[in-house]
């Protein structure tokens, strides 16, 4: 999966804007004039821009632009200049931002008169200055509004809340995944498809159509499939060839669960070692699981079938109580393999020539 920039809306709304242009060799005066023109409609009051040598050896530019009215934009590329894209933040404490910019400048440009304001979203300097320190909620809201990717979001959190980042990183990673969900890559099936060589292939086809091939969510629950039979008959390869799936062998690991999968496969796991077997077999929706080394989470937002594969010596049905077996039979199509059956077609022999 690749990281998404998300379809959530970027929002920048402040009278104090802090910009960082990484790997930008332009002179501060040139960038300052361009920024001044960009915010012209909001009546710019002051700008300071400094060139800094970053630890990676590249030149970075830091700029603080103050306006009489709040700059308002939902375009994350609004401050792009000649292909250089900046990190955009509200300057919660303009005094501190200005001090930071003046720390070790290699080149510097200023224009206008600095307005010492510390509270974001003030605007209109005629109403006086405020020394109120921004709250955590205000800082976090600003980060959420300005971040355009998962790495940028986590980087901004790390800079603003270093202690929280170090001690509660898993929570910030969770929120980052919610704000910027991964884009599901196109599924390329690595498992070859084949026609099963079964005595009753029609029953399998009848199960496949509504449970695997028809993906329209009409609210109905799917039906699972249970296959029990000898080893080396192609059960696993056939089951894995049907499409995107969650695959579990030896144990069920919910930490790797993929919500975009069409179906689940439980392969060669004894009945007593399969947690949530009822939810899986019953194709239930929205149930809570407890991944090992992780926190509880809700999975399966829609009904998904599960294909259970078992060898004859690990037949689930032999381990069930009468009540469990009744539930199993009501929610599963059961296919018990006959001798000679395989889940792949025998190779076609070339025709022999008559002598």
Curated annotation (Swiss-Prot):
It comes from Maize streak virus genotype D (isolate Raw). Belongs to the geminiviridae Rep protein family. The lineage of its organism: Viruses, Monodnaviria, Shotokuvirae, Cressdnaviricota, Repensiviricetes. This is Replication-associated protein. Keywords: ATP-binding, Covalent protein-DNA linkage, DNA replication, DNA-binding, Endonuclease, Helicase, Host nucleus, Hydrolase, Metal-binding, Multifunctional enzyme, Nuclease, Nucleotide-binding, Nucleotidyltransferase, Repressor, Transferase. A motif (RCR-2) lies at residues 60-62. GO terms for cellular component: host cell nucleus. The active site is at 100 (for dna cleavage activity). It is found in: Host nucleus.
């Amino acid at each position: 999966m690749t990281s998404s920039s998300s379809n959530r809306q970027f929002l920048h709304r402040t009278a104090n804007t802090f910009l960082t242009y990484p790997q930008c060799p332009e002179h501060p005066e040139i960038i300052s004039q361009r920024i001044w023109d960009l915010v012209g409609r909001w009546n710019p009051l002051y700008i300071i821009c400094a060139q800094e040598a970053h630890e990676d050896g590249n030149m970075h530019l830091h700029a603080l632009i103050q306006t009489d009215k709040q700059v308002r934009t939902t375009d994350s590329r609004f401050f792009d200049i000649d292909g250089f894209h900046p990190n955009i933040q509200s300057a919660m404490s303009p005094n501190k931002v200005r001090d930071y910019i003046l720390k070790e400048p290699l080149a510097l440009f200023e224009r206008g008169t600095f307005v010492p304001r510390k509270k974001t979203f003030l605007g209109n300097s005629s109403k006086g200055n405020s020394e109120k320190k921004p709250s955590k909620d205000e800082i976090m809201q600003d980060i959420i509004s300005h971040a355009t990717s998962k790495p940028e979001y986590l980087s901004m959190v790390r800079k603003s809340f270093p202690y929280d980042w170090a001690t509660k990183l898993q929570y910030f990673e969770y929120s980052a995944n919610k704000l910027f969900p991964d884009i599901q890559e196109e599924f390329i099936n690595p498992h070859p498809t084949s026609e099963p060589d079964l005595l009753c292939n029609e029953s399998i086809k009848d199960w496949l159509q509504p449970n695997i091939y028809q993906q329209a969510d009409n609210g109905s629950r799917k039906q699972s499939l249970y296959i029990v039979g000898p080893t080396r008959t192609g059960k696993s390869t056939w089951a894995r060839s049907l499409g995107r799936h969650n695959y579990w062998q030896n144990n069920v690991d919910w930490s790797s669960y993929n919500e975009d999968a069409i179906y689940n496969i439980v392969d060669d796991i004894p009945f007593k070692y399969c947690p949530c077997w009822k939810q899986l077999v019953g194709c239930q929706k929205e149930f809570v699981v407890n991944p090992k080394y992780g926190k509880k989470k809700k999975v399966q937002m829609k009904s998904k079938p599960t294909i259970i594969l078992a060898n004859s010596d690990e037949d689930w049905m032999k381990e069930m109580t009468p009540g469990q077996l009744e539930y199993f039979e009501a929610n599963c199509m059961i296919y018990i393999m006959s001798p000679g059956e395989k889940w792949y077609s025998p190779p076609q022999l070339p025709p022999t020539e008559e002598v």
